[in-house]
Amino acid sequence: MARPKNYSVSDVVERVVFAFWQHGYQSLGVRELEELTGLNQYAIRTEFGGKEGLYLTALEMYCERAISSAMAPMKDGKIPEIIAFLQALVTKGSMTSSQFGCLVVNTGIENARVNSPRLEVAVARYWDTLEAHFVASLRNAQIDGQIDPAVDIEAMANGLVSGVMGVHTKNRV
């Protein structure tokens, strides 16, 4: 009979999100993860599929928080919600202005070396979600007459996403 778990998966993930955000995927070794989580290498492998699985779970938690808090107002918003989102990127102390940059941007940059298809999909999904939120706000503003009907909303949203990536990269420096 298997022993019952003496840990909460969400508590374990909560403990590693910040560590991965601060140090990156490659810089955190399995021994450090064992110390942070209280789990041994076997438990990390069986519960999360190893270090990469734990990282993906942490990245997913981070993304869900950003989507449900920072991005959410743009889903039904217009220009003011986009402005508020962008201002938060440069407002010290906000979730989106961390000295560690953005975990998603950091993951994308680091994955150029790691070359994990799973990480690539997770990063792309986040940026697609952000772009969809920008499109929603821009389209609402266009319907409301705040943006000329001739403006390509998708191109504008794509440009905003690129700008967000740049700000997050700059925040890390």
Each predicted region: which residue ranges?
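Helix-turn-helix
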Residues: D11, A19-G53, T57
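Amphipathic C-terminal alpha-helical segment
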Residues: K92, T96, N140, L160-V173
